[in-house]
Amino acid sequence: GAAQIFCSSLKVSGETADCQGWGCLPGYVEANKDILVRFTKALYKAMDYGSQEANYDEVAGYVADICGTDKASVLEQAKEGNWIDNKTLLQYLGDGTLKNYYETQQKNFIDAGDIDKEVPVEDYVLFDVMEEAGK
């Protein structure tokens, strides 16, 4: 399949998925859902900004400064992806594409022996927070 790179670093290609995100313990989720929703809204704003090709140069400067690398290398890497906005991410959330990415990632972990058994991805991916932040 076609490769996808999200501003949140979610990368999918063919039968592999390298989903990356933010993690927190269940107790934190229960006590701070409002903070997680606000944080996710901020990530969505960053996705909207970072997905616009007109902003690649500026964003590459930020990334280069933070990572201690040169801007040209960051810009070159930006060409390797299809940076999406939050509207597209929410579409993937709604149509099950995003869930499928995480299920694929989990299958790869099982196949590699990194985890023992399958669990519902809803047990560790906060789809409800993503959805609420998109309202």
Predicted regions, residues:
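An extracytoplasmic/periplasmic, membrane-proximal ligand-sensing/linker region
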Residues: 56-135
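Pocket-lining segment of extracytoplasmic ligand-binding domains
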Residues: 1-65
